[in-house]
């Protein structure tokens, strides 16, 4: 087990999460008593208690007063906020995890983008206009792309779509910095944003779905062509 965390709390958190992932503390099992676990990890009981509370909020554990702490099946109890952690724990699964991430984005975007353009065209155009002034680099395009999708999600009038995008931000941003390092990816994205703007201007709402699906396929092809040179630390968490 290689743990890169620098603080005692960060170390304890990574130790417990990796132990759950590697079935040292399997789902459904009971964690060791607080004193035993703090000695095992090498942190104070106060630090451990704070970490356990945080992991419980993220769905890894169930803490009940007067009862032992139980390890959850995190696939059933956690939210989107653990995506980065999963990518860091299992590098081999990162390509599939990212494919799933992009598929989810495309699928839900077909709903909220069309709704935003149809019912709130002025707001949608304001969001899409950001593409006119973006700097031609990966960092700027990553922020722009996330900002446009998130902005249109909230502009749809259903804030739940925006909250979903909020949950995807961490891994989305890491993937974007690598994906948009490719000039072809940046060029394709600009074409896509301009197309959406045109559809908004012409009230061609029925074409939004096909526009999104086409962009999903074309951007997916670029992404797959880049997977062979994907850096191994793409999903490394900052601590």
From Swiss-Prot:
InterPro entries: FA-response_TF_FadR (IPR014178), FadR_C (IPR028374), TF_FadR/GntR_C (IPR008920), Tscrpt_reg_HTH_GntR (IPR000524), WH-like_DNA-bd_sf (IPR036388), WH_DNA-bd_sf (IPR036390). One of its GO terms (cellular component) is cytoplasm. It comes from the Bacteria. It is found in: Cytoplasm. Disulfide bonds: none annotated. Residues 34-53 bind DNA. Homodimer. This is Fatty acid metabolism regulator protein.
């Amino acid at each position: 087990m290689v743990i890169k965390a620098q603080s005692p709390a960060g170390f304890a958190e990574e130790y417990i999460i990796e132990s759950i992932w590697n079935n040292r503390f399997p789902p459904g099992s009971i964690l060791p008593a607080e004193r035993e676990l703090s000695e095992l990890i090498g942190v104070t009981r106060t630090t451990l208690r704070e970490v356990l509370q945080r992991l419980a909020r993220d769905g890894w554990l169930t803490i009940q007063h007067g009862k032992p702490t139980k390890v959850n099946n995190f696939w059933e109890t956690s939210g989107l906020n653990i995506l980065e952690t999963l990518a860091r724990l299992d590098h081999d699964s990162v390509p599939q995890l990212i494919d799933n991430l992009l598929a989810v984005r495309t699928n839900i975007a077909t709903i909220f983008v069309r709704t935003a353009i149809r019912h709130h065209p002025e707001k949608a155009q304001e969001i899409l206009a950001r593409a006119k002034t973006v700097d031609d680099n990966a960092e700027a395009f990553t922020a722009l792309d996330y900002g446009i999708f998130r902005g249109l999600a909230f502009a749809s009038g259903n804030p739940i779509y925006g909250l979903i995008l909020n949950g995807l931000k961490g891994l989305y941003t890491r993937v974007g910095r690598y994906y948009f390092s490719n000039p072809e990816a940046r060029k394709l994205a600009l074409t896509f944003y301009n197309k959406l703007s045109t559809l908004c201007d012409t009230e061609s709402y029925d074409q939004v779905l096909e526009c999104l699906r086409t962009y999903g396929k074309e951007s997916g092809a670029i992404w797959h062509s880049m997977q062979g040179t994907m850096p191994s630390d793409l999903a490394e968490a900052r601590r």
